[in-house]
Amino acid sequence: MHHPGPPRFVATGDEVELAPRDPDPTATYTWRLTQAPAQSTVSLGDDPVEHFVPDAPGRYVVRLTAPDGEHDLTVRAFPGTLESSGTHTSGRSGGHSGGVSGGRSGPGRSGSGEYTQAGDGSDGGGGGQPRLTLRPDIEGDEAVVRADCSPHPEGTETAADLAVEFLLDDRDDVDADAVTRDGTALRIPLDALPERARIHAVAVGNHGYSVPDAVEFTRGGDGVETVTSGAGVAARRPYDAPAWAEDSVIYEIYVRTFAGERDESPFDAITDRLDYLDSLGVDAIWLTPVLQNDHAPHGYNITDFFEIASDLGTRADYERFIEAAHDRGFKVLFDLVCNHSARTHPYFESAVEGPDADYREWYEWRSDTEPETYFEWEHIANFNFDHLPVRRHLLDAVAQWADLVDGFRCDMAWAVPNGFWREIHDYCKDRDSEFLLLDETIPYIPDFQAGLFDMHFDSTTYAALRQVGGGGDAEAILGAIEGRAEIGFPEHASFMLYAENHDETRYIVDYGREAAEAAAGALFTLPGAPLLYAGQEFGQRGRRDDLAWDHADETLQSFVSDLASARHDQPALSADADLVRIPYEVRDGPSDRVVAYARTTENDAAVVVLNFGSEPTTVGLPAGTDGTDLVSGEYRGAAGDGDATVTVDSVSVFPADENDLRQ
């Protein structure tokens, strides 16, 4: 179906990309407005991909005429004085919830995020964006959606000050007259439910509106969160990350150097190390790009989106690796590059010949011979997503690789139109609701939670870890985590935590062994899925060099494995556990090199102490904290002054009584 997707929530002045889904490049697609606020003067052009900018608050309905019929899309525009969570981001995808890519500066690369004190994303503390999570249920003969609203953490509003605006999905045949709304709840009689019904909403305050959320009801479906009724209706939350992903230990492999000095094909080398990765505690494996490219070792300059790189092997070799990984219970992530191709791609080599050349419209251009790109990268050229053949080509590639793997790590996600990611999200989720979409966006963008991606690179915590490693106050990492809510991420958002990757200098090189251990401890004990970059676990010093397997630091290796075990074994360290600030006293060593915090669930609690300093530290913790370290298994208690006193080298996790933590 060519329908352009879910309704959009935007502010006036925001740009909405209008594009047919599953496009046929040879077909005709036209757009027209069928409803707009009385004061609006906006109009649409004649292109198959249009860029629509609401100019007045209110509701718009845009109609697409396509080969399979007519499709309506609702766009709800709020006054431009209201801010969405995208307002304080920069770069190509920094618009609001319905926004499209725009601008040319782009966010930074993986390591260029700069940590600032949490709260800087608000409007000064008086308002800011609220947050929203929708809860679906079946009550008697009704499908019910309840909205849990939270005001901005630093704002003056309360939950009672917030309104909720619901929109039915234009793709579903729901009788609007049968729907009732009661404050923060929406109800649909079960006998009025079609085969599929999707409901979208935002929370609206005096200063902003939230990241949209959605729920879905299906008849006879297999939703992730299912409630059974006599009518056989299933309910799910389509914007949640897959359950397997939230607590996965993700392992990034730089494909061409993983084997080290062994004379072995890359896929065979990785397969041979699967038992090692299992013993390390890894759950998911992310390979850097494996497609045919311009021979740059990183693989991000693609020359064929449908073929495995010849220096890595064949498609059959790749599939054998995936099968072996799946047999051992690993998930496999494919590094998906959509923003650009290499300049040695045959289509670009044709396009650059002149303004009338074949494939000229496939790319964006600065001049007759110079394509658009970012950061003056000279080996790539940005695709033109207004050209339907580009979208078709990339969607076909997505379909080919999605059938093999368990998720996509989406390269330069900020540089690709939001609407295109929404289409990929819906395509992947419709075929497998447990498929993962992980975005590389620096800095992260809260609106990307709204049906674009399931999990986000936590570049803010990354930057805080780097600042702490360089001598900053260790409590900065708590501010970084709390900052997620303060810039608008809802409570159901998921994150990937990292201290290094293929774009960054190794943490151990910049800050030393002790700080590297503490940073690893942060990854495994803070809310989010921890990422290990291959070699990080044994002290590899080169960023993209051959892995020095024969010189691995086995003590560090064992330490990281113990961290992974603690993460898997302790419910209080799970992604869903609360992060709680606690009182603590550093009694030996520099106090700003140490941070302590608690993780709690309804039935479990643990206290974490991280020491970024070069010497062991003694710390006083709340009474009720057990001195047995859940990472090492050693008793770390020491004589104290009536509280729990412990000695910590770099990382320790202690069982605790939640009732004592908040006193």
From Swiss-Prot:
The keyword Cytoplasm applies. It catalyses: Endohydrolysis of (1->4)-alpha-D-glucosidic linkages in polysaccharides containing three or more (1->4)-alpha-linked D-glucose units. It comes from the Archaea. Optimum pH is 6.5 in 2.0 M NaCl. Stable over a range of pH 5.7-9.2. Its EC number is 3.2.1.1. Optimum temperature is 45 degrees Celsius in 2.0 M NaCl and at pH 6.5. Relatively stable up to 55 degrees Celsius. Gene3D superfamilies: Glycosidases (3.20.20.80), Golgi alpha-mannosidase II (2.60.40.1180), Immunoglobulins (2.60.40.10). Stable and active over a broad range of NaCl concentrations (0.5 to 4.2 M NaCl), with maximal activity at 2.6 M NaCl. 83% and 94% of the maximum activity at 0.6 and 4.2 M NaCl, respectively. Active and stable also in KCl. Residues 1-28, 80-135 are annotated as: Disordered. The active site is at D411 (nucleophile), E440 (proton donor). It is found in: Cytoplasm. One of its GO terms (molecular function) is alpha-1,4-glucosidase activity. One of its GO terms (biological process) is amylopectin catabolic process. The record marks D503 as: Transition state stabilizer. Pathway: Glycan degradation; starch degradation. It is an enzyme of class 3 (hydrolase). One of its GO terms (cellular component) is cytoplasm. Belongs to the glycosyl hydrolase 13 family. Alpha-amylase that cleaves starch into oligosaccharides, the first step in starch degradation. Endo-acting enzyme which prefers a linear polysaccharide to branched polysaccharides hydrolyzing alpha-1,4 glucosidic bonds efficiently. Also has transglycosylation activity, but does not act on alpha-1,6 bonds. Higher activities of 100%, 79% and 67.8% against amylose, soluble starch and amylopectin, respectively. Lower activity of 22% against glycogen and faint or no activity against alpha-, beta- and gamma-cyclodextrin. PANTHER family: ALPHA-AMYLASE FAMILY MEMBER, NEUTRAL AND BASIC AMINO ACID TRANSPORT PROTEIN RBAT. This is Alpha-amylase MalA. It comes from Haloarcula japonica (strain ATCC 49778 / DSM 6131 / JCM 7785 / NBRC 101032 / NCIMB 13157 / TR-1).
